[in-house]
């Protein structure tokens, strides 16, 4: 589990295919510069969130680590297939402070940035998500975007999906990869765990589910 509070901005330095050059079904190995993330207590097999996706550390050295990413994960996430900056967070420990909200690191789907611009001292971010994700979004609810715990500012259901907006304070823009966003960019989305369980409980108690 994670909190959605980014601990460091690292960088994917190398993307190495795990199979032969002609095998398109294999995954890749990512070599990630830690960007100042403290790796002293990270063991092989531990989890680190990279752009909101939970990955298992399979190699570690001074200032960097490596993870293997399956082709399936690559097809359903953004920002993991080429070198670039990435948000990093180590897995939550029992005694850690929960500064954001409970985040599993399992990406539910991709969203598309429709608007990203300064508004006063902050930035307004608008994202178009699928209806399947949109049904879990609520005003002042939580959502994870590229591994960052954020608060939903508005929700607008549209024929082509659900557009929601977020207000980003200057600190969040400065210390995460969200500062690189622009219209058309794809982002990793994870819905709030509580919203997921509430939806399941409501569907399980419906007359159709009971019959």
Named regions from a protein language model:
Residues 1-211:
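Conserved loop->alpha-helix
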């Amino acid at each position: 589990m994670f909190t959605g509070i980014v601990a460091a901005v690292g960088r994917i330095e190398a993307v190495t295919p795990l199979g032969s050059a002609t095998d398109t079904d294999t995954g890749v190995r990512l070599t990630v510069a830690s960007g100042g993330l403290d790796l002293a207590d990270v063991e092989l097999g531990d989890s680190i969130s990279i752009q909101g996706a939970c990955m298992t550390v399979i190699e570690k050295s001074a200032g960097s680590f490596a993870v293997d990413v399956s082709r399936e994960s690559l097809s359903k996430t953004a920002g993991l297939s080429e070198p670039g900056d990435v948000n990093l967070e180590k897995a939550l420990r029992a005694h850690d402070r929960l500064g954001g909200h409970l985040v599993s690191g399992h990406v539910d789907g991709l969203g598309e940035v429709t608007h990203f611009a300064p508004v006063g001292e902050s930035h307004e971010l608008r994202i178009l998500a699928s209806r399947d994700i949109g049904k879990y979004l609520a005003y002042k609810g939580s959502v994870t975007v590229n591994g960052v715990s954020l608060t939903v500012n508005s929700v607008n259901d549209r024929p082509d999906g659900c557009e929601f907006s977020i207000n980003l304070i200057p600190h969040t823009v400065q210390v995460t990869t969200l500062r690189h966003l622009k219209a058309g960019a794809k982002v990793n989305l994870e819905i709030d765990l509580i919203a997921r369980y509430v939806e399941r409980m409501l569907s399980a108690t419906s007359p159709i589910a009971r019959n």
